[in-house]
């Protein structure tokens, strides 16, 4: 059963720490069912102290203690790490979840063996505030219970969707890269506020909260974004002037170009 599974994280960096924090703080996973190891003992001890998770001395000890392993190390570590633990993973029939960017399910299976159930998960930076948008895909060996585990884990630090692996590049261009675009937009709003007399800190709070509320409105409404735009724009009013200025300066085309550029770069890697 999903609730009985023990999960181990190889790697305790920022993303892994955010995921572990979400898993425990959401109440969806018990801290004593989670194991963590990292070459940086300080990071592991911090998670152990703050969240009550188990510390493993190394990857092999961790694998022998859990049912599911989350690979949360840098992609360039895979070539040396995975062959060194493949025997233990195969012997136990361990379910492997990777959150490493740019490593396909096939590449992971090539390093671990073709009989290993593997899921690939792509969270975004907003996992650190438990508002991530994640996507996942699996090989044919992943069963329904394991898929449910992936969704339960990812939903503990945000929202999650299942997509085909070939769509990961466009998902990355939107969910992975757009936080940076959103930060730029929010900062631009704030700087415009400063230009017109607001203090920077106050302007930033106003801009960020407004964007947060607008995003929430879209998620909680069945209305198309342009319907919401029309509702805010009064005839001859201030908002329609700003909307027209954005259109005249290529706002929509610029956003599309940014996504296209990120998508093409991801495909070329």
Question: What is the predicted function of each stretch?
Answer:
Residues 1-64, 131-132, 194-196:
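NAD(P)+-binding Rossmann beta1-loop-alpha1 motif at the extreme N-terminus of oxidoreductases
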Residues 2, 208-269:
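NAD(P)-dependent Rossmann-like dehydrogenase/reductase catalytic/cofactor-binding core
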Residues 17, 21-25, 49, 83, ...:
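Short, well-ordered alpha-helices that flank and scaffold nucleotide-derived cofactor binding pockets
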Residues 34, 44, 62, 108, ...:
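Small-residue helix-packing motif on alpha-helices
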Residues 51, 59-136:
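Rossmann-like NAD(P)(H) cofactor-binding subdomain of soluble oxidoreductases
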Residues 107-117, 133-171, 183-220, 265, ...:
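Internal alpha-helical scaffold of NAD(P)-dependent oxidoreductase catalytic cores
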Residues 119, 168-173, 225-230:
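Short pre-catalytic strand/loop immediately N-terminal to key active-site residues, enriched for Gly-Thr
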């Amino acid at each position: 059963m999903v609730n009985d599974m023990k999960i181990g994280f190889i790697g305790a960096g920022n993303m892994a720490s955010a995921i572990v924090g979400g898993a425990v703080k959401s109440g969806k996973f018990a801290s004593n069912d989670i194991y963590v190891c990292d070459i940086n003992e300080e990071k592991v001890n911090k998670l152990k102290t703050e969240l009550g998770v188990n510390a493993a001395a190394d990857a092999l000890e961790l694998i022998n203690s859990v049912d599911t392993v989350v690979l949360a190390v840098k992609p360039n570590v895979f070539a040396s790490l995975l062959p060194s633990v493949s025997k233990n993973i195969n012997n136990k029939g361990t379910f492997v979840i990777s959150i490493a960017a740019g490593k396909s399910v096939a590449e992971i299976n090539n390093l671990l063996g073709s009989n290993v159930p593997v899921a690939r998960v792509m969270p975004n930076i907003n996992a650190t505030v438990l508002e991530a948008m994640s996507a996942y895909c699996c090989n044919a060996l992943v069963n329904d219970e394991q898929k449910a585990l992936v969704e339960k884990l990812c939903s503990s630090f945000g929202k999650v969707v299942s997509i085909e692996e070939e769509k990961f590049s466009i998902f990355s261009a939107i969910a992975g890269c757009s936080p940076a675009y959103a930060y730029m937009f929010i900062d631009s709003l704030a700087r415009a506020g400063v230009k017109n007399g607001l203090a920077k800190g106050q302007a930033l709070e106003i801009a960020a909260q407004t964007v947060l509320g607008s995003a929430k409105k879209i998620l909680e409404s069945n209305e198309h974004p342009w319907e919401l735009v029309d509702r805010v724009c009064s005839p001859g009013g201030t908002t329609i002037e700003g909307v027209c200025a954005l259109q005249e300066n290529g706002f929509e085309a610029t956003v599309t170009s940014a996504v296209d550029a990120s998508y093409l770069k991801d495909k070329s890697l």
